[in-house]
């Protein structure tokens, strides 16, 4: 068996960096038997496309944007286009990411915004700094904050709600000018940039408006306005928002005396980017025969080629997929098949259920220690369960056997399909159910009138098919 395992080989044919966001790798693996090559190739391809994960930008919060269908003044791209551009940004981390991280972007036009303008945490790097994000004209400005997370943290916080201090940017009037990309337009905060908002006054407060005030108050929103009625711009925006999304801040834009405005009064919402965590772009495989097809002789090689987004080397991605499959099958090797009813009985006790799950929990140290032993000897090792679980198993099997015995005790002999003559003779000797024969030995049965060796032989054959034995109940009592 050692010779068969040593016959396998893995070779990296070539790895080519086609562009910063496309890293190509080609590998060969084999030889396999005719029935194994397709299984291995398909398993590797599905693992590469489904099980590998990386970090990505998950949420955006853009200053002045409340929903995905908004547009920004002075920005060529719509908010949907910005979300798609951020979705395509490939990131890699120099150290493990254990919690969500945040980055920033503060630029103004005219100019082109690229990934190099983003401010990332020290442990995060952008694969392609020249990746395009947006184009701004003279009146354009783009101030946003984005969240970076891995797949695990993203699933735990899928219903992510941004706190009211998420943007956490001080008064825009006190910004350091060095934080912006371009400042050619000196009248960026001019009064013409923010048009005055017209108000619609309601003649009287109706019953419906009172219900509206009570409804909004239940969410903690302020219902006291300087003027009755809703702003036209507010009303239009609220009609086109997701009805299940609550705005982070319900206050209007207010200019201050210096022509600036307070960022705490801006309407902002966290926008879901729908990130792509898998760094694998595409996987292909080809199965080739290296010699004439022969039965049960390894003669097929699997050629696999894959493309990554540049955040991971193809060789590392391929080895990670192999390690994932190996770990999964190691679990199956150590798994113990348990009867469904036995597992239910065992899990009724909180003490045994806790130890049961801890026993089968994946532990790197456990599998590393087993790996050395497995390489030396390929005989399967016994997987031991805690003593408490073994005691529960013994009790369960004993109860199951007692229940089975009780079932056979009441089974009529007519259900055994015995010859009519034997059934009639047993009935004359007061044997009507199987439990009656379990109490008497074959020698004692032969002493009865009308029962000979042939009759005992037929009964023993019928009982063996049921897993029973003549006189077994009498032997236990002795």
UniProtKB/Swiss-Prot annotation:
InterPro entries hit by this protein: DNA-dir_RNA_pol_insert, DNA-dir_RNA_pol_RpoA/D/Rpb3, RBP11-like, RNApol_insert_sf
Transmembrane segments: none
EC class (word): transferase
Region (Alpha C-terminal domain (alpha-CTD)) residue spans: 365-478
Record-level GO BP terms: DNA-templated transcription
Oligomer status and interactors: In plastids the minimal PEP RNA polymerase catalytic core is composed of four subunits: alpha, beta, beta', and beta''. When a (nuclear-encoded) sigma factor is associated with the core the holoenzyme is formed, which can initiate transcription.
Domains as described in the record: The N-terminal domain is essential for RNAP assembly and basal transcription, whereas the C-terminal domain is involved in interaction with transcriptional regulators and with upstream promoter elements.
Protein name: DNA-directed RNA polymerase subunit alpha
Annotated gene: rpoA
């Amino acid at each position: 068996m050692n010779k068969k395992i040593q016959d396998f080989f893995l070779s990296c044919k070539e790895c080519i960096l086609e562009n910063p966001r496309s890293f190509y790798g080609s590998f060969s693996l084999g030889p396999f038997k005719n029935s194994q090559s397709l299984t291995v190739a398909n398993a590797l391809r599905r693992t590469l496309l489904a099980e590998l994960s990386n970090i990505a930008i998950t949420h955006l919060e853009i200053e002045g944007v409340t929903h995905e269908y908004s547009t920004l003044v002075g920005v060529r791209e719509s908010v949907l286009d910005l979300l798609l551009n951020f979705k395509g940004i490939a990131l890699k981390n120099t150290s493990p990411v254990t919690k969500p991280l945040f980055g920033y972007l503060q630029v103004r036009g005219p100019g082109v915004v690229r990934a190099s303008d983003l401010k990332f945490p020290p442990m995060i790097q952008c694969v392609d700094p020249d990746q395009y994000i947006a184009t701004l004209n003279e009146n354009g400005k783009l101030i946003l904050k984005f969240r970076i997370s891995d797949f695990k943290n993203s699933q735990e916080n899928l219903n992510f709600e941004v706190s009211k201090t998420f943007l956490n940017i001080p008064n825009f009037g006190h910004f350091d000018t060095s934080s912006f990309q371009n400042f050619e337009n000196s009248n960026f905060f001019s009064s013409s940039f923010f048009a005055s908002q017209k108000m619609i006054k309601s003649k009287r407060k109706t019953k419906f408006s009172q219900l509206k005030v009570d409804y909004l108050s239940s969410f903690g929103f302020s219902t006291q306005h300087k003027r009755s009625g809703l702003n036209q711009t507010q009303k239009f925006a609220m009609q086109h928002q997701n009805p299940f999304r609550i705005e982070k801040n319900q206050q209007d834009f207010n200019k201050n005396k210096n022509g600036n405005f307070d960022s705490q009064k801006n309407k902002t919402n966290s926008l879901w980017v729908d990130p792509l965590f898998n760094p694998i772009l595409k996987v292909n495989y080809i199965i080739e025969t290296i010699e004439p097809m022969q039965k049960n002789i390894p003669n097929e090689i699997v050629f696999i080629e894959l493309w990554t987004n540049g955040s991971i080397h193809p060789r590392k991605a391929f080895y990670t997929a192999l390690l994932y499959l190996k770990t999964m099958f190691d679990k199956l090797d150590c798994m113990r098949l348990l009867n469904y009813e036995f597992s239910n009985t065992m899990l009724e006790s909180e003490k045994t259920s806790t130890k049961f799950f801890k026993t089968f929990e994946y532990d790197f140290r456990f599998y590393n220690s087993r790996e050395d032993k497995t390489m030396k000897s390929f005989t399967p090792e016994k997987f031991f369960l805690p003593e408490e679980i073994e005691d529960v198993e013994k009790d369960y099997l004993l109860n199951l056997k007692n229940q089975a015995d009780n079932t056979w005790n009441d089974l009529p002999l007519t259900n055994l399909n015995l010859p009519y003559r034997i059934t009639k003779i047993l009935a004359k000797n007061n044997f009507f159910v199987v439990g009656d024969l379990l109490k008497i030995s074959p020698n004692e049965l032969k002493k009865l009138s009308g029962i000979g060796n042939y009759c005992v032989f037929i009964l023993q054959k019928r009982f063996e098919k049921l897993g029973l034995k003549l006189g077994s109940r009498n032997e236990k009592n002795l």
